[in-house]
């Protein structure tokens, strides 16, 4: 074996080793309500290799009742803000992308008084503060628009009220906030609505087939964003 050939082999091996050593998976932190928890089961599969998904802990308690925001369920914007005020102080919280949704729990209404859980002005303020916390950490962010309901179906739930017009209004508020900060959005509202009236298994949650479609849609949006980011940095 001549000297040049040996050098080529060594260089090739070193390049492969360097590539392996420098390999760094893309870390996502996904925070959202029960809809996020349900499509989250398939999100990793559709993202494929090279992605790590991190979440708020507590799946076992969160799945006991999807209407009660505990454990890994992010809940309303007030709860998300409180959680992030603590989370940003964790040195290990430094994902490559933060994917967020909150809204379904914000628009809950007391069936007796009609009082909404989080008023519009407070929702806007909470989102602004959330953005500020994440941007101060220099973490890129994506916003997932809140999924809708069909009022006549949701009305069967007697624990609390929720109306699609409120979801649309709060989605518009979120659009204004995040567009002003150039935060990319994933329009899960429109995508899910397009799946038809049979998409629900209860008042607000979706069939396994629709959950898989949601996961694939979100994964595709994230991968496209990442490819665009890679292109810009080349």
Q: PLM features: residue spans?
A:
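Bacterial N-terminal signal peptides that target proteins for export
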Residues: 1-8
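A generic structural signal for short, solvent-exposed coil/turn residues
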Residues: 12, 45-47, 177
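Hydrophobic alpha-helical membrane context
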Residues: 15-18, 45, 199, 221
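Alpha-helical cap/lid subdomain in secreted, periplasmic
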Residues: 78-233
């Amino acid at each position: 074996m001549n000297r040049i050939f040996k050098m080529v082999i060594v260089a090739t091996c070193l390049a492969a080793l360097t590539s392996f050593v420098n390999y760094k998976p893309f870390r996502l932190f996904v925070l959202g309500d029960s809809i996020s928890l349900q499509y989250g089961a398939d999100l990793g599969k559709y993202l494929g290799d090279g992605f790590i998904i991190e979440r708020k802990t507590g799946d076992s308690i969160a799945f006991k009742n999807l209407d009660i925001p505990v454990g890994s369920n992010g809940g309303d914007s007030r709860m998300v803000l409180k959680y992030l005020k603590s989370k940003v102080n964790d040195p290990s919280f430094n994902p490559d992308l933060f994917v967020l949704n909150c809204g379904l729990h914000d628009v809950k209404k007391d069936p007796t008084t009609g009082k909404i859980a989080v008023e519009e002005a407070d929702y806007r303020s909470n989102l602004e503060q959330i953005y500020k916390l994440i941007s101060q950490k220099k973490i890129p962010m994506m916003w997932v628009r809140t999924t809708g309901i069909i009022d006549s179906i949701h009305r069967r739930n007697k624990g609390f009220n929720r109306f699609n017009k409120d979801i649309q209004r709060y989605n518009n508020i979120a659009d204004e906030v995040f567009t002003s900060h150039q935060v990319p959005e994933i329009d899960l509202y429109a995508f899910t609505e397009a799946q038809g009236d049979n998409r629900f298994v209860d008042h607000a949650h979706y069939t396994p087939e629709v959950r898989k479609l949601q996961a694939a849609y979100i994964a595709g949006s994230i991968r496209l964003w990442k490819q665009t980011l890679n292109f810009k940095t080349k």
